[in-house]
């Protein structure tokens, strides 16, 4: 089973009292599988990993692995600010049954490129899971440069990168490193279609929490080089790309999920979607139903 196509960075549903809503979690997982996603990320930034206890982390990963039952790839977010803690969290995810570790660059500490190289090598050597690098400078404060990635691609336990930067030059530099054992995944919904048309292997998406089938359709078209159809779907989904960044992730996408009956909000310091954006959430949640139906029909006809 390849690591490619549409991979959803799952939001974590909470109940009205703020505890994990495992019934909603299982329903979200089934909706994702029914929509055709090819992988899931558990307890990443979209999953509010920083707000989860160790026991909650274990519960989410274990439940996802059991629910998925080998049907798609399970990636667990394991990146923390220190190398030793990241290794320990990666080992924890391995014990829980995850197939891959999604390892973000260490937040806040801003290591040098040499430090990033040593960090990822240590995690790959000692974590017990295949590592997918994750670069998202807007959140972490450091940028994993292509030349550093180039020094990591030969490591047998480093199998890909999720790149949230969208510049064509960055994407091209990473796509040039692709191989049978190293994949390039977009981490930006808004530019993902163009990245895949340029050779990227897939998308780790936020908005696919609410529209799994539509984003599967987008990825299928872009990955097979169907420019006109891919661009048409990218246009249909452009409002969702934008909306999911209108406030800090995962605030907007959790507003969409709540309207679909999944979850009841966020944990501090994140607050619910502001009143000014609620009408847009209402409209987009309603429109998502039609887009999911259209994408399903197209995939059945393809």
Swiss-Prot record:
GO BP terms: diaminopimelate biosynthetic process; lysine biosynthetic process via diaminopimelate
Binding positions (pyruvate): 46, 204
A Pfam family: DHDPS
UniProt xrefs under SUPFAM superfamilies: Aldolase
GO-annotated molecular function: 4-hydroxy-tetrahydrodipicolinate synthase activity
GO cellular component: cytosol
Location in the cell: Cytoplasm
Active site (catalytic residues): 134, 162
CDD domains registered for this protein in UniProt: DHDPS
Keywords: Amino-acid biosynthesis, Cytoplasm, Diaminopimelate biosynthesis, Lyase, Lysine biosynthesis, Schiff base
PROSITE patterns: DHDPS_1, DHDPS_2
Protein family membership: Belongs to the DapA family.
Name the record gives this protein: 4-hydroxy-tetrahydrodipicolinate synthase
Organism: Xanthomonas campestris pv. campestris (strain ATCC 33913 / DSM 3586 / NCPPB 528 / LMG 568 / P 25)
Taxonomic path: Bacteria, Pseudomonadati, Pseudomonadota, Gammaproteobacteria, Lysobacterales
């Amino acid at each position: 089973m390849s690591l490619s196509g549409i991979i959803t960075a799952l939001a974590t549903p909470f109940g009205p009292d703020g505890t994990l809503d495992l019934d909603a979690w299982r329903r979200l997982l089934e909706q994702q599988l029914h929509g055709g996603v090819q992988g899931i990320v558990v307890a990443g930034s979209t999953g509010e990993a920083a707000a989860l206890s160790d026991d909650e982390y274990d519960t989410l990963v274990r439940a996802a692995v059991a629910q998925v039952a080998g049907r798609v790839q399970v990636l667990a977010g394991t990146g923390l600010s220190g190398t030793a803690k990241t290794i320990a969290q990666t080992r924890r995810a391995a014990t829980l049954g995850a197939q891959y570790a999604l390892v973000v660059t260490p937040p806040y500490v801003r290591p040098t490129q040499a430090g990033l190289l040593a960090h990822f090598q240590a995690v790959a050597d000692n974590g017990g899971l295949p590592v997918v690098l994750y670069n998202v400078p807007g959140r972490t404060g450091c940028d994993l440069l292509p030349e550093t990635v180039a020094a990591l691609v030969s490591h047998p336990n480093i199998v890909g990168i999720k790149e949230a930067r969208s510049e064509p030059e960055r994407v091209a530099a990473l796509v040039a490193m692709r191989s049978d054992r190293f994949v390039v995944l977009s981490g930006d919904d808004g530019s993902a279609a163009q990245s895949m048309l340029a050779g990227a292997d897939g998308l780790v998406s936020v908005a696919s929490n609410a529209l799994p089938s539509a984003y599967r359709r987008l990825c299928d078209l872009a990955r097979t080089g169907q420019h006109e159809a891919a661009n048409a779907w990218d246009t249909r989904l452009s409002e969702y790309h934008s909306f999911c960044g209108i406030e800090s992730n995962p605030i907007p996408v959790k507003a969409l999920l709540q309207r679909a009956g999944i979850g009841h909000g966020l944990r501090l310091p994140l607050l619910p979607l502001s009143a000014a954006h609620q009408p847009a959430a209402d409209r987009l949640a309603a429109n998502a139903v039609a887009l999911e139906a259209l994408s399903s029909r197209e995939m059945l006809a393809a």
